[in-house]
């Protein structure tokens, strides 16, 4: 497993000349990959990698290359495979011989063996690029849910890609320029982003579940996986047992690591469940779990309940701490710390984000990194299991548009007139919302309420969840911490 940063520059139609921008791009990747950095000059470009080593620190150096006869492939990979052992076993039966214990080699050989079909066989989170030396073309891919980021821009005959926007901006062909749509993205739908949009002019993002080739025909991306509706035939008891199996299996698979592992513990259902399963699984292996909880100075005095958080976390956290035989850690933040963290949070995210919410996660991850390198969190459980108020509130559910943002008037009022000219806030937001709704899959027998619930789920997965995944990735990796 390698949690890190990848980047590359490919120029197909003219001779390629590297420049000082290589060091500039690598410098932007340092925080995501503090352990190792690698550069591979190519016939038509360069592949870059910065690594936070989690599995096989010595054997997993990248970029990684395989050669046999005239065939040669090189990979830069960011992510983790939760079925790495199964894939490795299949490949070994087919004659592949492994030199390392890392996921990178598994993914490289799987791609060479099965091509694009390796993605459908993979259980994990990843973003990677493979250069085919013989055919002089590049393959890009991103995991199904978009946990791992992958941005790109096309400048004439040159493809520039990377794990973060700042890495692309370090190349001289990519100026940090906003057009009218970019301003609208920040002011109207931020901290979210339109799927596939990189906000800065000309910068895009490989969408979740998509892959494709860059060759003399250009960059051609397509989905290899899409969310589909299927009839639910299980009983309530069967559903509960099935969900339990999937959750326990996912948690156990994500505990695999050659470095210390911990869990976020907020006292909620998701983090409590993860911490409990992880604690017992690690105890069986003779390991002790570390849990990490966050509070704010004087939170008990000033806490105000709301729709998103009707209760303070502290009491539930203490109940779980009493229940679990783990080593528990508290982080208490004060307002001055959050204020100082605001600037770093924007630097980490490359864009305006969620203000103190980003800053608190950044500071929390930094504290956690003092004890462990990997942490499991319950991020996005509400998106998958329908935990938000708008799933339960019929009035909100039936309103058109994004359920979490019914109007943008207040935000739009901050723009100067010269910047606001030509932007229709309602039309912009409605067009983005409708584009997402058109991708919703239904069943013929769905009632109007069931259709609306599917639409709500789609909106949450494509917008709200992507915002949280983006936030988690940037804040944690900026701190040198891998959060799963």
At which residue positions do the language-model features occur?
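Cysteine-centered catalytic environments shared across enzyme families
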Residues: 2-348, 361, 433
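Glycine-rich active-site loop/lid subdomains used to bind and stabilize high-energy intermediates
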Residues: 49, 216, 309-312, 316-484
């Amino acid at each position: 497993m390698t949690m890190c940063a990848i980047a590359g520059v490919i120029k197909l139609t003219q001779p390629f000349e590297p420049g000082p921008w290589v060091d500039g791009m690598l410098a932007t990747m340092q925080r995501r990959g503090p352990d190792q950095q690698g550069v591979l000059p190519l016939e038509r470009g360069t592949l870059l990698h910065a690594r936070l080593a989690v599995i096989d620190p010595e054997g997993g150096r990248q970029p990684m290359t395989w050669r046999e006869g005239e065939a040669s492939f090189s990979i830069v990979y960011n992510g983790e495979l939760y079925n790495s052992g199964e894939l490795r076993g299949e490949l070994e039966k087919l004659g592949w011989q492994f030199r390392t214990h890392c996921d990178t080699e598994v993914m490289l050989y799987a791609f060479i063996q099965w091509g694009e079909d390796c993605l459908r066989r993979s259980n994990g989170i990843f973003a990677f690029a493979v250069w085919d030396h013989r055919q002089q073309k590049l393959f890009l891919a991103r995991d199904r849910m978009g946990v791992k980021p992958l941005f790109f821009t096309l400048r004439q005959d040159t493809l520039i890609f990377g794990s973060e926007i700042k890495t692309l901006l370090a190349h001289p062909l990519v100026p940090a320029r906003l057009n009218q749509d970019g301003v609208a993205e920040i002011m109207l739908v931020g901290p979210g982003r339109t799927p596939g949009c990189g906000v800065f002019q000309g910068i895009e993002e490989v969408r979740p579940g998509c892959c494709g080739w860059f060759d003399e025909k250009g960059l051609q991306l397509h989905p290899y996986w899409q969310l589909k509706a299927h009839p639910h035939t299980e009983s309530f008891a069967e559903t509960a047992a099935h969900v339990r199996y999937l959750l326990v299996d996912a948690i156990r698979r994500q505990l695999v690591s050659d470095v210390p592992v911990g869990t976020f513990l907020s006292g909620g259902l998701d983090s409590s469940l993860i911490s409990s399963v992880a604690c017992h699984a690690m105890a069986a292996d003779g390991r002790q779990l570390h849990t990490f909880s966050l509070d704010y100075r004087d939170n008990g005095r000033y806490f105000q309940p709301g729709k998103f958080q009707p209760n303070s976390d502290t009491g539930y956290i203490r109940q779980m701490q009493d229940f679990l035989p783990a080593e528990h850690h508290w982080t208490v933040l004060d307002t001055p710390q959050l204020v100082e963290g605001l600037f770093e949070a924007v630097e980490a995210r490359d864009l305006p984000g969620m203000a103190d919410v980003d800053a608190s996660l950044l500071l929390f991850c930094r504290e956690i990194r003092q004890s462990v390198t990997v942490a499991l969190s319950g991020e996005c459980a509400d998106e998958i299991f329908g935990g938000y108020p708008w799933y339960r509130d019929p009035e909100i559910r039936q309103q058109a548009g994004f359920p979490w943002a019914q109007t943008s008037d207040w935000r739009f009022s901050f723009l100067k007139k010269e910047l606001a000219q030509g932007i229709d806030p309602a039309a912009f937001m409605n067009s983005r919302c409708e584009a997402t709704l058109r991708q919703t899959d239904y069943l013929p027998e769905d009632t109007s309420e069931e259709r609306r619930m599917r639409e709500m789920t789609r909106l949450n997965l494509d917008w709200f969840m992507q915002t949280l995944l983006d936030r988690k990735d940037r804040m944690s990796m900026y701190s040198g911490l891998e959060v799963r």
